[in-house]
From Swiss-Prot:
GO terms for biological process: cell division; DNA biosynthetic process; DNA recombination; DNA repair; lagging strand elongation. PANTHER family: DNA LIGASE (PTHR45674:SF7), DNA LIGASE 1/3 FAMILY MEMBER (PTHR45674). CDD domains: Adenylation_DNA_ligase_Arch_LigB, OBF_DNA_ligase_Arch_LigB. ATP binds at E234, R241, R256, E286, F325, R398, K404. It holds the Pfam family DNA_ligase_A_C. The lineage of its organism: Archaea, Thermoproteota, Candidatus Korarchaeia, Candidatus Korarchaeales, Candidatus Korarchaeaceae. Belongs to the ATP-dependent DNA ligase family. Its EC number is 6.5.1.1. It comes from Korarchaeum cryptofilum (strain OPF8). It catalyses: ATP + (deoxyribonucleotide)n-3'-hydroxyl + 5'-phospho-(deoxyribonucleotide)m = (deoxyribonucleotide)n+m + AMP + diphosphate. InterPro entries: ATP-dep_DNA_ligase, DNA_ligae_ATP-dep_bac/arc, DNA_ligase_ATP-dep, DNA_ligase_ATP-dep_C, DNA_ligase_ATP-dep_cent, DNA_ligase_ATP-dep_CS, DNA_ligase_ATP-dep_N, DNA_ligase_N_sf. The gene is lig1. It comes from the Archaea. This is DNA ligase 1.
Length: 541
């Protein structure tokens, strides 16, 4: 497939607001293309380049892309606004003639170049990435350059969300949408179904991460027990959730975003080899940093995952402990549809030191449950999760089978803009605009702003990330692609005409950076509204 064909298709998708038309265009692409070619074309169209479980990254910032494009087009780097950059590429490259004998770009060729960019490491890697970027952009026509630039920075803005891809796949292969949805939860993403030529998989596959089952929030432990009845309470650990895949001595770890994080965890791999009595297994657990039996702050734990290459000293400085709480696959048998109590019972015979099971209590008594939760809090944990005893494991679903109860009001929000601070903080972008997700429109709606809660080291890290994610600057303000998720505590939620969302957090404070969460896992505007309405009812009592 020529890149020109894909770019023209992208422009047709961009020109229509009709979901039906978008589905028709994407399904036609899938039908008429070789599975591997369609797989790569969809990754480019959606601005992913690599699927969620692939740990590779391009590491190409807007600044790098601008440098390459401006050297080819003669554009002056007057800003870093995404729209202006694309406009510059389209207009200025359009005025240049491509050599008559130059071979047209293909999707396969471009994808190989992108793979080579992701593999550039070590001294001179930046220059190598720039040289590789020059190859396609020097030959691209305006439409090809438009698609390629936006795909590289993950901003194609074609409205091709996962739901639309699922519909397109179902239409292309004549499958039921519900079946495609189920397969996506097990395989982790829709791209893999296209790569398989429409072949669906409903059972867990070893070394292929599933989407994690998620918990909804409950206002109190008492209301959670009232809703679920007799249930299991588990400690809610303040750590990094991991999916553990084991076959013999081969062990791999996947984050809740389905990224392969095995290289960061050589010490934990050894724990699994000695502490999991199974030939083959897929387990769910939580990693925490511990010292003298107590959890260390999340900010310390996350340092183990911030480097592309693990510093061996961090293994001793930040010792990790794995706690297991669920079983998905055991020696070829799927446990997805087995009830929670049966999965937990099986785990009791599988897990031994140095791995541990998350502490659990089965009860229908709110007072007994409160004692258990207070014990969890005293030991330095976040709270508890209440789990329905007969619940199956449903990948990718945030349902009412699991209810989380925490001590403080908090939301997971996304940074969409920031301002430089004052005084000592003038070096950093340290005042953050925080947004909740609107699942209907795909927008992120601002619900507050804060500069509180972070260390100087974290200000430095976020400032660097924001520069990489920039889509425009106005004075001290930087607007960014919504990628950084933070956990935010607050006193209450108020109605406010200041923001499009209609809400504003009072006394917002960032409690931690959630590197392990994707923007799609951020709290929704509906959740914000729900908390606000419960506050109002409470005040009226």
């Amino acid at each position: 497939m020529l890149l020109k064909e894909l770019a023209e298709l992208a422009m047709r998708i961009a020109s229509t607001s009709s979901r039906r038309d978008k589905v028709s265009l994407v399904s036609d692409l899938i039908r008429r293309s070789d599975p591997e070619e369609a797989y790569k074309a969809l990754l480019i169209l959606t601005g992913r380049i690599f699927p969620p479980s692939d740990p590779r990254e391009l590491n190409v910032s807007w600044a790098t892309l601008w440098k390459v494009v401006s050297s080819l087009s003669g554009a002056e780097p007057t800003g870093v606004d995404a729209g202006e950059l694309v406009k510059s590429i389209v207009e200025r490259r359009g005025k240049r003639q491509t050599a008559l004998l130059e071979e047209p770009l293909t999707v396969e060729e471009v994808y190989k170049i992108l793979e080579a960019i992701s593999e550039a490491e070590g001294p001179g890697s930046k220059g190598k990435r720039e040289a590789l970027l020059t190859i396609p952009f020097s030959r691209a026509d305006p439409s090809e350059a438009w698609l390629l630039a936006n795909a590289i920075v993950g901003e194609t803005r074609l409205g091709l969300n996962e739901g639309l891809l699922i519909e397109s796949i179902a239409q292309a292969y004549g499958l039921r949408k519900e079946d495609v949805e189920r397969a996506v939860m097990v395989l982790g993403d829709p791209y893999e179904i296209v790569r398989r030529g429409g072949k669906l998989e409903f059972e867990p596959v070893l070394f292929r991460p599933l989407k994690p089952m998620l918990a909804q929030s409950s206002d109190s432990l008492r209301s959670a027990i009232e809703e679920l009845g007799r249930c299991a309470l588990e400690y809610k650990l303040d750590g990094v959730r991991v999916q553990v895949h084991k076959r013999g001595d081969e062990v791999r770890f996947f984050s809740r975003r389905m990224s392969d994080i095995t290289k960061s965890l050589p010490d934990v791999s050894d724990q699994v080899r000695y502490g999991v009595r199974a030939g083959e297994a897929i387990l769910e657990g939580e990693l925490i940093a511990e010292r003298d039996g107590r959890p260390l702050p999340f900010q310390i734990l996350i340092r183990r995952f911030k480097r592309r290459q693990l510093d061996p000293r961090l293994i001793e400085e930040i010792p990790l402990k794995l706690y297991i709480f669920d079983l998905i696959l055991l020696d070829g048998s799927s446990y997805l549809r087995k009830p929670y109590f049966e999965r937990r019972e099986k785990l009791e015979g599988l897990i031994e030191d140095p791995v541990s099971l998350v502490r659990s209590l089965i009860t229908s008594d709110p007072d007994e449950g409160m004692d258990f939760m207070e014990e969890a809090l005293r030991e330095g944990h976040e709270g508890v999760i209440a789990k329905k005893l007969n619940s199956p494991y449903i990948p990718g679903v945030r349902g009412r089978y699991w209810l989380k109860v925490k001590e403080t009001n908090s939301l997971d929000l996304v940074i969409v803009a920031a301002e430089r601070g004052y005084g000592r903080r003038h070096r950093w972008y340290s005042d953050y605009y925080l947004a909740a997700r609107d699942p209907e429109s795909g927008e992120f709606l601002i619900v507050g702003k804060t500069f509180k809660g972070l260390t100087d080291e974290e200000f430095e890290w976020i400032t660097q990330k924001l520069e990489e994610l920039s889509i425009g600057k106005e004075g001290k303000l930087i607007r960014v692609r919504p990628r950084i998720v933070v956990e935010v505590s607050f006193n209450e939620i108020q109605r406010s005409p200041k923001y499009k969302s209609g809400f504003a957090l009072r006394f917002a404070r960032i409690t931690r950076i959630r590197d392990d969460k994707s923007p799609e896992e951020a709290d929704t505007i509906e959740r914000v509204r729900e908390i606000y309405e419960k506050q109002i009812r409470k005040f009226q009592l």
